[in-house]
């Protein structure tokens, strides 16, 4: 089934196991990693891809990604530095990747939305406006996952 809207996208993500959601969340976040150079964020996304990740690792990585999110938010400034804002949303997407299953009902959806926000901020920063193809790329990634 081709997914071409957010209602179907969110519903399909919600049917996945937490492990599957974590894998997709990492994929969604990986697509925007070029917008954030923070090693804490990269480490969280990389670790989220591991099927054997422990709850202790998840908690530590969540705190690291949260610290990166707070640091990047502080860099945005009063005038909204859009590139820094993009990095902030990448860090938030990474937080979703390593969030406790009890803290989120749909990890992949949360990461997808933050990744879209990151891409939107980046396109504003470069003067391209708010149109981008991040949602379409996410729909395709989910379809690929479903077809395995």
Regions found by a protein language model. Give the residues of each.
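Structured binding/interaction patches within domain cores
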Residues: 1-148
């Amino acid at each position: 089934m081709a997914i071409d809207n957010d209602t179907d996208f969110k519903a399909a993500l919600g049917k996945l196991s937490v492990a599957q959601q974590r894998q997709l969340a990492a994929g969604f976040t990986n697509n925007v990693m070029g917008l954030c150079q923070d090693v804490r964020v990269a480490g969280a996304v990389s670790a989220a891809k591991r099927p054997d990740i422990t709850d202790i690792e998840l908690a530590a990585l969540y705190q690291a990604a949260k610290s990166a999110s707070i640091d990047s938010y502080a860099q945005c400034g009063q005038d909204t530095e859009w590139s820094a804002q993009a990095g902030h949303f990448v860090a938030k997407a990474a937080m979703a990747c390593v969030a406790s299953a009890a803290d989120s009902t749909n990890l992949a959806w949360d990461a997808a939305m933050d990744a879209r926000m990151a891409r939107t901020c980046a396109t504003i920063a470069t003067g391209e406006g708010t149109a981008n193809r991040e949602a379409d790329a996410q729909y395709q990634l989910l379809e690929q996952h479903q077809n395995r």
